[in-house]
Amino acid sequence: MATMVSPSLLAADFLHLDSEIEMINRSEADWLHLDVMDGVFVPNISFGFPVLEAVARKCTKPLDVHYMIVHPEHYIEQTRKLGAMMMNVHVEACTHLHRTIQEIHQAGMKAGVTLNPASPVSLLEDIIDDVDMVLLMSVNPGFGGQKFIENTIQKVQRLRELIDKSGSKALIEIDGGVQNETAPRLVQAGADVLVAGSYVFGSKNPEQVIHDLRTL
Protein backbone atom coordinates (compact mmCIF):
# COMPACT_ATOMS: atom_id res chain seq x y z
CA MET A 1 0.00 0.00 0.00
CA ALA A 2 1.29 3.45 -0.91
CA THR A 3 2.02 5.75 2.00
CA MET A 4 -0.91 8.07 2.63
CA VAL A 5 -0.35 11.78 3.20
CA SER A 6 -2.57 14.10 5.24
CA PRO A 7 -1.18 17.67 5.09
CA SER A 8 -1.87 19.68 8.24
CA LEU A 9 -3.77 22.90 7.66
CA LEU A 10 -2.28 24.33 10.86
CA ALA A 11 0.88 25.18 8.88
CA ALA A 12 -0.96 26.87 6.00
CA ASP A 13 -0.98 30.59 5.26
CA PHE A 14 -4.31 31.63 6.75
CA LEU A 15 -4.30 34.92 4.83
CA HIS A 16 -4.41 32.83 1.65
CA LEU A 17 -6.40 29.83 2.82
CA ASP A 18 -8.41 29.68 -0.40
CA SER A 19 -5.33 29.15 -2.57
CA GLU A 20 -3.78 26.78 -0.01
CA ILE A 21 -6.84 24.52 -0.20
CA GLU A 22 -6.86 24.73 -4.00
CA MET A 23 -3.27 23.45 -3.89
CA ILE A 24 -4.32 20.55 -1.66
CA ASN A 25 -7.19 19.75 -4.04
CA ARG A 26 -4.77 19.63 -7.01
CA SER A 27 -2.20 17.60 -5.14
CA GLU A 28 -1.92 13.86 -4.53
CA ALA A 29 -2.77 14.34 -0.83
CA ASP A 30 -5.07 11.60 0.43
CA TRP A 31 -6.70 13.62 3.22
CA LEU A 32 -6.56 17.07 4.82
CA HIS A 33 -5.61 17.07 8.52
CA LEU A 34 -7.39 19.64 10.70
CA ASP A 35 -6.04 20.32 14.21
CA VAL A 36 -8.61 21.74 16.62
CA MET A 37 -7.07 23.04 19.88
CA ASP A 38 -8.82 24.60 22.86
CA GLY A 39 -6.01 26.11 24.94
CA VAL A 40 -6.96 23.77 27.80
CA PHE A 41 -6.00 20.25 26.72
CA VAL A 42 -3.03 21.75 24.85
CA PRO A 43 -1.32 25.13 25.38
CA ASN A 44 -2.52 26.70 22.15
CA ILE A 45 -5.74 27.72 20.39
CA SER A 46 -6.07 26.99 16.68
CA PHE A 47 -9.44 27.32 14.94
CA GLY A 48 -13.04 26.26 15.44
CA PHE A 49 -16.15 25.44 13.47
CA PRO A 50 -16.42 28.63 11.35
CA VAL A 51 -13.04 27.78 9.79
CA LEU A 52 -13.81 24.04 9.62
CA GLU A 53 -17.09 24.72 7.83
CA ALA A 54 -15.43 27.07 5.32
CA VAL A 55 -12.69 24.52 4.63
CA ALA A 56 -15.24 21.71 4.23
CA ARG A 57 -17.08 23.71 1.56
CA LYS A 58 -13.91 24.19 -0.47
CA CYS A 59 -11.83 21.06 0.09
CA THR A 60 -12.38 18.03 -2.14
CA LYS A 61 -10.22 15.72 0.01
CA PRO A 62 -11.58 13.66 2.93
CA LEU A 63 -11.30 15.59 6.19
CA ASP A 64 -9.15 14.07 8.95
CA VAL A 65 -10.19 16.04 12.06
CA HIS A 66 -7.94 15.85 15.13
CA TYR A 67 -9.41 17.19 18.38
CA MET A 68 -6.87 18.31 20.96
CA ILE A 69 -9.58 19.44 23.34
CA VAL A 70 -11.36 18.45 26.54
CA HIS A 71 -14.72 16.69 26.04
CA PRO A 72 -14.40 15.96 22.30
CA GLU A 73 -17.53 13.80 22.59
CA HIS A 74 -19.57 17.02 22.78
CA TYR A 75 -18.70 17.80 19.15
CA ILE A 76 -19.46 14.52 17.39
CA GLU A 77 -22.68 15.79 15.81
CA GLN A 78 -21.11 19.04 14.61
CA THR A 79 -18.21 17.09 13.14
CA ARG A 80 -20.63 14.80 11.33
CA LYS A 81 -22.42 17.81 9.86
CA LEU A 82 -19.11 19.01 8.42
CA GLY A 83 -18.91 15.82 6.43
CA ALA A 84 -15.70 14.73 8.17
CA MET A 85 -14.36 11.32 7.21
CA MET A 86 -12.31 10.73 10.38
CA MET A 87 -12.69 12.05 13.93
CA ASN A 88 -9.60 11.63 16.09
CA VAL A 89 -9.88 11.92 19.88
CA HIS A 90 -7.15 11.69 22.49
CA VAL A 91 -7.05 8.73 24.84
CA GLU A 92 -6.01 11.21 27.53
CA ALA A 93 -9.08 13.41 26.96
CA CYS A 94 -11.79 10.74 27.00
CA THR A 95 -13.07 9.34 30.28
CA HIS A 96 -15.32 6.88 28.44
CA LEU A 97 -13.29 6.16 25.31
CA HIS A 98 -15.19 3.07 24.17
CA ARG A 99 -18.50 4.94 24.28
CA THR A 100 -17.03 7.89 22.38
CA ILE A 101 -15.72 5.59 19.64
CA GLN A 102 -19.15 3.94 19.38
CA GLU A 103 -20.83 7.34 19.06
CA ILE A 104 -18.41 8.43 16.33
CA HIS A 105 -19.19 5.27 14.38
CA GLN A 106 -22.92 5.70 14.93
CA ALA A 107 -22.58 9.19 13.43
CA GLY A 108 -21.22 7.60 10.25
CA MET A 109 -17.56 8.59 10.65
CA LYS A 110 -14.37 6.62 11.09
CA ALA A 111 -12.95 6.78 14.62
CA GLY A 112 -9.33 7.48 15.41
CA VAL A 113 -7.64 7.50 18.81
CA THR A 114 -4.57 9.60 19.53
CA LEU A 115 -1.70 9.03 21.96
CA ASN A 116 0.50 11.80 23.33
CA PRO A 117 4.27 11.12 23.31
CA ALA A 118 4.37 10.00 26.97
CA SER A 119 1.35 7.68 26.67
CA PRO A 120 2.23 4.00 26.11
CA VAL A 121 0.86 1.86 23.30
CA SER A 122 -0.41 -0.59 25.94
CA LEU A 123 -3.30 1.81 26.66
CA LEU A 124 -4.82 0.67 23.37
CA GLU A 125 -4.90 -3.08 24.03
CA ASP A 126 -8.60 -3.21 24.93
CA ILE A 127 -9.74 -0.78 22.23
CA ILE A 128 -7.58 -1.58 19.19
CA ASP A 129 -10.22 -3.79 17.54
CA ASP A 130 -12.78 -0.97 17.66
CA VAL A 131 -10.81 1.85 16.04
CA ASP A 132 -10.08 2.66 12.42
CA MET A 133 -6.84 4.49 13.09
CA VAL A 134 -4.29 5.26 15.79
CA LEU A 135 -2.60 8.65 15.63
CA LEU A 136 0.76 8.79 17.39
CA MET A 137 1.99 12.25 18.32
CA SER A 138 5.70 12.45 17.54
CA VAL A 139 5.92 15.91 19.11
CA ASN A 140 4.16 17.32 22.15
CA PRO A 141 0.79 18.57 20.88
CA GLY A 142 -0.06 22.24 20.63
CA PHE A 143 2.39 23.78 18.20
CA GLY A 144 3.65 23.06 14.69
CA GLY A 145 7.28 22.96 13.60
CA GLN A 146 8.60 21.06 16.64
CA LYS A 147 11.53 18.63 16.73
CA PHE A 148 10.70 14.97 16.17
CA ILE A 149 10.74 12.78 19.31
CA GLU A 150 13.10 9.95 18.41
CA ASN A 151 11.54 7.08 20.39
CA THR A 152 8.46 7.40 18.15
CA ILE A 153 10.15 4.92 15.79
CA GLN A 154 10.11 2.18 18.44
CA LYS A 155 6.59 3.19 19.42
CA VAL A 156 5.39 2.69 15.82
CA GLN A 157 7.00 -0.75 15.82
CA ARG A 158 5.24 -1.70 19.08
CA LEU A 159 1.92 -0.44 17.74
CA ARG A 160 2.38 -2.36 14.48
CA GLU A 161 3.00 -5.53 16.51
CA LEU A 162 -0.16 -4.92 18.57
CA ILE A 163 -2.28 -4.32 15.46
CA ASP A 164 -0.93 -7.36 13.61
CA LYS A 165 -1.31 -9.60 16.68
CA SER A 166 -4.92 -8.52 17.29
CA GLY A 167 -5.96 -8.72 13.64
CA SER A 168 -7.13 -5.11 13.78
CA LYS A 169 -7.40 -3.17 10.52
CA ALA A 170 -6.41 0.11 12.20
CA LEU A 171 -4.14 2.43 10.27
CA ILE A 172 -1.14 4.06 11.95
CA GLU A 173 -0.89 7.82 11.48
CA ILE A 174 2.04 9.97 12.63
CA ASP A 175 1.84 13.69 13.41
CA GLY A 176 4.83 15.88 14.22
CA GLY A 177 8.29 16.46 12.78
CA VAL A 178 7.57 14.56 9.56
CA GLN A 179 10.18 15.52 6.95
CA ASN A 180 12.65 13.98 4.50
CA GLU A 181 14.82 12.38 7.21
CA THR A 182 12.10 11.00 9.51
CA ALA A 183 9.43 10.01 6.98
CA PRO A 184 11.23 6.98 5.44
CA ARG A 185 12.08 5.60 8.89
CA LEU A 186 8.47 5.98 10.04
CA VAL A 187 7.17 4.14 6.99
CA GLN A 188 9.76 1.38 7.45
CA ALA A 189 8.67 1.03 11.10
CA GLY A 190 5.05 0.49 10.01
CA ALA A 191 3.35 3.88 9.60
CA ASP A 192 0.52 4.07 7.04
CA VAL A 193 -0.37 7.78 7.10
CA LEU A 194 1.96 10.77 7.47
CA VAL A 195 0.71 14.15 8.69
CA ALA A 196 3.01 16.88 7.39
CA GLY A 197 2.54 20.55 8.16
CA SER A 198 5.44 22.94 7.78
CA TYR A 199 7.31 20.41 5.61
CA VAL A 200 4.52 20.71 3.01
CA PHE A 201 3.23 24.26 3.39
CA GLY A 202 6.69 25.76 3.99
CA SER A 203 8.06 24.21 0.81
CA LYS A 204 8.58 26.05 -2.48
CA ASN A 205 6.88 23.12 -4.22
CA PRO A 206 4.35 21.59 -1.80
CA GLU A 207 2.72 19.39 -4.43
CA GLN A 208 6.07 17.76 -5.17
CA VAL A 209 6.71 17.21 -1.45
CA ILE A 210 3.33 15.48 -1.13
CA HIS A 211 4.14 13.32 -4.17
CA ASP A 212 7.52 12.37 -2.73
CA LEU A 213 6.01 11.39 0.64
CA ARG A 214 3.44 9.18 -1.07
CA THR A 215 6.13 7.26 -2.95
CA LEU A 216 8.07 6.23 0.17
Language-model segments: what does each one mean?
Residues 177-189:
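Acidic, divalent-metal-coordinating active-site segment for phosphoryl/phosphodiester hydrolysis
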Residues 118-120, 179:
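Short acidic loop-to-helix transition motifs that present clustered carboxylates
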Residues 1-88, 94-96, 103, 111, ...:
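Conserved N-terminal beta1-alpha1 strand-loop-helix module at the mouth
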Residues 33, 173-174:
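Generic enzyme active-site microenvironment
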Residues 110-114, 118:
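Internal catalytic-core helix/loop-beta-alpha segment
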Residues 90-92, 116, 137-140, 197-198:
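Short beta->alpha connector loops at strand-helix junctions that form conserved
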Residues 174-177, 195-199:
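Glycine-rich beta-strand-to-loop/alpha-helix junction loops that act as flexible
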